[in-house]
């Protein structure tokens, strides 16, 4: 059974470097049997490599603005990514990546870490560093959802619209 950890983000943009930091930690001291891919700010470039691995499980970790307190961690349903307003620094939306690989992967898990400061040349904030440490510490014994809560309307300022999907439409004007 192959498990792939895709770490996404830009280490030059403060808290958006959460994914790359996790990849560095795993490179220095691997946890469990994860194949770690540092997708950086263009994770779509790794689609072919992920497909070739035919992983049983793909865990995508990225700093994601969910409207929570900095450093909070939530599982986001991959089917909801496209319909949620999320700030992103990536070249392509992550739902594009998920759509490209979903037929070659047993299970796709998307783990968001709430950033505080995403700006060029800013340091990563302590709450996000701590959150990366929490994710790292759970990789070796990962079962099911890793012990992380799902993002739900009750846990964030999301509103539910349309087909029962979570969106951040009301937050568009606050950024």
Task: Set out the residue ranges of the language-model regions.
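Short, positively charged low-complexity motifs
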Residues: 147-149, 155-166, 173
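N-terminal catalytic or cofactor-binding beta/alpha core of small enzyme domains
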Residues: 1-115, 122-146, 168-175
């Amino acid at each position: 059974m192959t498990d792939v950890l895709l770490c996404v983000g830009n280490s030059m943009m403060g808290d958006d470097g959460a994914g790359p930091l996790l990849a560095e930690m795993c490179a220095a001291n691997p946890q469990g049997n994860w194949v770690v891919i540092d997708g950086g700010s263009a994770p779509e470039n790794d689609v072919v490599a992920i497909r070739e691995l035919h992983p049983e499980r793909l865990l995508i970790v990225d700093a994601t603005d969910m409207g929570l307190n900095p450093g909070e961690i939530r599982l986001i349903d991959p089917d909801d990514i496209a319909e949620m307003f999320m700030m992103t620094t990536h070249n392509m939306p992550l739902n594009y990546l998920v759509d490209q690989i979903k037929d070659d992967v047993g299970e796709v898990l998307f783990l968001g870490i709430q950033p505080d400061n995403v700006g060029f040349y800013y340091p990563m904030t302590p709450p996000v560093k701590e959150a990366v440490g929490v994710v790292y510490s759970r990789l070796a014994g990962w079962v099911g959802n890793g012990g992380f809560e799902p993002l739900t309307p009750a846990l964030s300022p999301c509103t539910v619209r349309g087909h029962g999907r979570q969106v951040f439409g009301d937050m568009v004007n606050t950024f």
